[in-house]
Amino acid sequence: CPTDVRMPKSYLHDEPGAMRAEQHGFDPFEQVASRVDAFEANGHTAEKIELLVLGGTWSSYPRDYQEHFLRRCFDAMNGRDAASIDRALAWNEQAARRNVGLVLETRPDHVDPDEIRWMRHLGCTKVQMGAQSLDDRVMRMNRRGHTVQQLRDAMIQLRAAGFKLVLHWMPNLHGATIESDREDFARLWSDPALRP
């Protein structure tokens, strides 16, 4: 993964979303407000917003920071400042710019019943996870820090909790071959715990 001291791990400073974040000093309110303004300036409606919070393993951030960050995102959509995430979410139900989907990134080894409840409390509707590979040997060689079984267990739990799911898979990782990648990709569609 690329490492840029200005960005969360795996993100480059010249990606559009990363550039916007840096331009606004990573302030969640300013990022959302400027993005909404840009959409509206280009003639798009911002009545329904899907908010993607990118930048690594969301679950590894302190929970008070998570609440603050999302509250400020919702404050930008609501057009007023809330004292709590609960208030911000409640106001957003009637706001002119309603959030219709909140996407958070995490890792399979961070998913457990407590984390699932917490993500629901924050209003999360979709979870993105980096599987990267379905081969434990390749994952060990790339120091992923979790196993295929942990990925399967996380997907089963998240699906049972009603989350929409996005799974990132990467071909050509260290230790993989064209043939092993083909087999790996086929497992994405044949494994009942992983397939859409």
Model-found features: residue ranges?
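Local cysteine-cluster metal-coordination motifs and their immediate loop/turn environment
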Residues: 1-5
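Conserved non-cysteine loop/helix-boundary elements of the Radical SAM core domain that shape
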Residues: 8-34, 51, 55-166, 170-196
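N-terminal phosphate-binding caps/lids of nucleotide- and nucleic-acid-binding domains
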Residues: 37
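Replace the tail clause
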Residues: 41-51
